[in-house]
A protein has these predicted regions:
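SIR2/sirtuin-family catalytic core signature
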Residues: 1-105, 117, 159, 163-165, ...
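Short, compositionally biased "basic patch" segments
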Residues: 57-69, 135-160, 234-253
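Metabolite-binding pocket within alpha/beta catalytic cores that recognizes anionic/polar moieties
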Residues: 83, 90-92, 97-103, 107, ...
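Adenosine ribonucleotide-centric catalytic and binding domains
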Residues: 103-154, 209-225
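Short hydrophobic beta-strand that contains or immediately precedes a catalytic carboxylate
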Residues: 108-111, 199, 292-293
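Short, solvent-exposed loop/turn segments at secondary-structure junctions
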Residues: 114-117, 203-205, 247-250, 296-298, ...
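A short secondary-structure junction signal
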Residues: 208-212, 252-259, 302-306
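Active-site gating loop/helix substructures
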Residues: 216-285
């Protein structure tokens, strides 16, 4: 079966390509870049430098052993740079473990709002804060609730109550209209995960990305809908999208305001596993490895559910879960996140705060 590591045979490939030319794409691009001076392949006649159309090919066919050595060295240095191993030394072993799981098809991506932002949609926190003026709510107070208390559920409830559901829905559909040209890390997902995907997002970025890649989802299900089909799709390798919190235009299956969160998770401050979403998440979390992408993993009901599952089941009985996360510069905040993730049996791969381009680069490493 073709995979990113073992692509399908190309009957139109040249002899050079069949021989292995092009297998080190990033290394070849560096060698062929005239402005990159660390590695140069040159041809000289006396003191005159004769330009080469493809220095990488000259290197490859000129000294295959040296080419392979330098390509391997480049890959190792590039991997260390992307994983920021100087700052986060545990990233290397964690990444290698994650990559093995991805190659074996054991990982399901769990996609949050950050991935839609990389595609051109508004950032979720700033979007909510920008609604405060229209809702006559104190923006500074709401910012504290979001940044200090991670009270997205409560802020959302107050905004929807003040604006009215119909107005909120209409504005959301316009503000989060899927861009025609989607770029960023999210575009790599169809190549990495050609099967089932989970998201808490209301937008339709994932649907568009998979459609653009000619790998459209066979079906979409929601967390409060008929989610049983999603479990059958995973072992079958069918391409299903689980929109955990539903679609914005379907109030019966949506999880948006406090009343809907209570109906989905329970309303007394506890996680109830006889309620739809905790029951669904428990079954998934105990059966498959997740890779959290674009998720803040703040102390909301979803992460609380995972923490409760880990407590009830015992971490030794759970598959490994992973997250690509920006590392807070504040030591106390990082310690709090570390503890929350440990309690939920989620292993972070950190990158520097604010430098979200590393997510795309890490996903690129998984493809190599």
């Amino acid at each position: 079966m073709p995979t990113p590591q073992h692509p399908p045979f190309d009957p139109d490939a040249s002899l050079e390509e069949l021989a292995g030319v092009g297998k080190n794409r990033r290394f070849d691009e560096i060698i062929d870049d005239e402005e990159f001076e660390d590695i140069q392949v040159i041809c000289k006649r006396g003191e005159e430098v004769i330009p080469l159309a493809k220095p990488s090919r000259a290197f490859y066919f000129g000294d295959r052993n040296l080419y392979d050595q330098e390509a391997k060295r480049f890959d190792q240095e590039e991997k260390a740079r992307i994983l920021n191993t100087d700052q986060f030394p545990r990233n290397l072993a964690r990444f290698d473990e994650l990559k093995r799981s991805c190659q074996r098809g054991f990982v399901i991506p769990f996609v949050g709002a950050g991935m839609s932002k990389s595609a051109g949609c508004p950032e979720w926190r700033e979007y909510l804060l920008n609604l405060c003026d229209d809702a006559n709510l104190d923006r500074d107070v709401m910012r504290v609730r979001l940044e200090e208390n991670s009270d997205y559920e409560g802020v959302m409830h107050d905004l929807v109550t003040a604006l009215g559901v119909n107005r909120f829905n209409l504005d959301f559909e316009r503000d989060f209209k899927t861009p025609d040209d989607i770029e960023g890390a999210v575009t790599l997902l169809p190549k990495l995960f050609d099967s089932s995907v989970i998201t808490t997002n209301f937008d339709r970025v994932l649907e568009k990305v998979y459609e653009n890649d000619a790998t459209s989802f066979v079906e979409k299900v929601t967390g409060r809908g008929q989610a049983g089909a999603f479990f059958r799709a995973i072992p079958a390798g069918d391409r299903y999208l689980l929109k955990l919190h539903g679609n914005l235009d379907n109030a019966a299956e949506r999880v948006l305001n406090k009343a809907e969160y209570d109906a989905a998770y329970g309303n007394d401050g506890n996680i109830h596993f006889d309620f739809p979403l905790p029951k669904l998440l428990k079954r998934l979390f105990t059966s498959y490895s997740f890779l959290f992408l674009g998720c803040s993993l703040s102390a909301d009901r979803t992460i609380q559910t995972f923490m409760r599952v880990a407590q009830l089941e015992g971490q030794e009985n759970l598959p490994h879960h992973y997250a690509l996360l920006a590392c807070p510069t504040d030591a106390a905040k990082k310690a709090a996140i570390d503890q929350r993730l440990a309690d939920a049996h989620i292993t972070p791969l950190w990158y520097p705060e604010g430098e979200h381009g590393y997510v795309e680069q890490m996903l690129g490493l998984l493809l190599d």
